[in-house]
Amino acid sequence: MGPTTATDAGARMKPTTVASAVHRVQMALYDGAAASREPLLRAAASLLSGPDYADVVTERSIADACGYPACPNPLPSEDARGKAAPRFRISLREHRVYDLEEARKFCSERCLVASAAFGASLPPDRPFGVSPDRLDALVALFEGGGGGGGDGGLALGFGASGDGKEVEEGRKVEIMEKEAAGTGEVTLQEWIGPSDAIEGYVPRRDRVVGGPKKEAKQNDACSAEQSSNINVDSRNASSGESGMVLTENTKAKKKEATKTPLKMFKQDEDNDMLSSCISDSIVKQLEDVVLEEKKDKKKNKAAKGTSRVGKSKPAKRPVGRDGHEVDFTSTIIMGDHGSEMMDHGALGQYNFSSSILANEQPSSSQYAAIDSVQAYTEELDELFSNAVNIAKDETSDDSGRCTLRSSLKAVGSKNAGRSVKWADENGSVLETSRAFVSHSSKSQESMDSSVRRESAEACAAALIEAAEAISSGTSEVEDAVSKAGIIILPDMVNQQQYNNDYDNDKDAGENEIFEIDRGVVKWPKKTVLLDTDMFDVDDSWHDTPPEGFSLTLSSFATMWAALFGWVSRSSLAYVYGLDESSMEDLLIAGGRECPQKRVLNDGHSSEIRRALDTCVCNALPVLVSNLRMQIPVSKLEITLGYLLDTMSFVDALPSLRSRQWQLMVLVLLDALSLHRLPALAPIMSDSKLLQKLLNSAQVSREEYDSMIDLLLPFGRSTQSQASLPS
């Protein structure tokens, strides 16, 4: 007793391994430790694998105990189960087959389901790297009931209540999300992607909090250097008698010629106010210019036809409020036919667009910016008035040129062209539009002439090709003309004249000569399938299809065409039992020429043959069962394989149904019953069974006989077989 106790104590002092712990847990489950305490079975799930649990179920069933460790009931006796109990059970409702051998390891269906669910939840392999303390606690829980291992039961999540009953105590687990990623790691946000990865979606937190902060940072970074671009487009500002288009580009630069990033104003209110300030002031000045020019035009009628385009002269460079210099360029174009065609109405309208690029610091408030723009606009008005006065003085020189000088053009700045063109210089708007239309018509005529030239060259090349083919004698006239792509059209004008002459009963000899002459290329007199009306004549080579006509083949036609392409001389020789020496005598069979076997070099024939073998093997067992054949299926397959070896497979297999494939195999077997499989002759002569198969395949007896004639062109009687050429 003493040595045994010492040995057990020594075994417990040794470090516990995973294998030894699994074995001791299996033994505890085998002895029924989990029968009285079901939570122990869930504790064993942390150590056992699927195969380990299956071993426990098998050992318990051998010991006539229920295979489910949590069940204390024994297995039913053999007398209760029956000695001749079946092994499998077929469920017609679920269309499944159940193995009852596994069910015999359990006392009831409930234990079978519970055991299968528990076994499916176990991992396929044992856990790796379990600490020895946890192994000792788990083993002590099974062997000592949770008390021998100290707090081993509590460490596993099981404790004992005051009344001795074990209660399950779940361990508190707290999940912490790592905020900062270590080296070589990525955060969850980087791995999944930003929240705005979906196009058009902006999270609410980014819309409220993130947006203004980011914009503020960008404004601080670009506060030193920034620019603005304001595009003002004011159309239909005022009405006038002559069309007029004004385009003004105002640019503001710093003294240093350095590249600075452009900063767009995003305030819509500022844009509207700036647009109104600039457009109202300049359009007002522009109206005064137009009125004064009209007065001068009446006084100086001789200067109407002179050119009013001149080069610009340098003027003073305006200085803004912040000291930056501004380049201003204006262009006035009057009477442009393009703008007249675009505008609606009899009178032209002003199309005004202005662009200001200013390199200045954004003011602290919108009102300060508006004040600076108003002051800047007043300076523009004064300079523009000076430029108009200079232009008036230049209209009276001898050269007759009217030049509108730039009001803000500086020396050394980028040159820009300015021109003033009156609408009546080229006549009225209607005359200008007519000139534009005539120019477009001329370009269209030139394009048509080039197309006609290319067509003539193509026709000449086709005629030369046809003439060479006819002169060489390689082809006839009609073939050469069709190959060259030439279509000879009838003379519709002379055709009507010839018909009238024929109706007036002219000389018969002349009519005969006329018929002979024009009979060389006789145009058909039936409607043709072409889209143009030019070919809508009688007697065509292409007749219109009748009503209800369809190119889709029936199932019988599809099967007949497939057999017609498969059969070769070798097939007929094999069916009639002839040797290879007599195959030449089968050149003409049933009034048609029987070809030799053909095999494609690219391997498609073998692929088609393998697919056909699959279809035949699927249809043959059903056919044997329906016809109650006594011949083994293997022999039928071998004989059919020899027959298929003699056939030609060039085209793809037709898409047939299973009933139709069975009929195809039946045709082959019927042909083989003549010489190769004579035992099938009585079955093939049974009209009732045969008619039943024909009805299922939707084929009549006459159609079936026509398919048999492809394989038996000389008939199936012995006399016709003996009369074959040998």
Curated annotation (Swiss-Prot):
Region (Disordered): 209-242, 294-323
Compositional bias of kind Basic and acidic residues: 209-218
One CC-aspect GO term: cytosol
Polar residues bias locations: 220-241
Major location (coarse): nucleus
RTR1-type ZnF: 43-131
Catalyses which reaction(s): O-phospho-L-seryl-[protein] + H2O = L-seryl-[protein] + phosphate; O-phospho-L-threonyl-[protein] + H2O = L-threonyl-[protein] + phosphate
Annotated positions binding Zn(2+): C66, C71, C107, C111
Root EC class: hydrolase
E.C. designation(s): 3.1.3.16
Localisation per UniProt entry: Nucleus
Keyword line: Hydrolase, Metal-binding, Nucleus, Protein phosphatase, Zinc, Zinc-finger
Family annotation (PROSITE patterns): ZF_RTR1 (PS51479)
PANTHER family listed in its UniProt record: RNA POLYMERASE II SUBUNIT B1 CTD PHOSPHATASE RPAP2-RELATED (PTHR14732:SF0)
Family of the protein in this entry: Belongs to the RPAP2 family.
Protein name per UniProt: Putative RNA polymerase II subunit B1 CTD phosphatase RPAP2 homolog
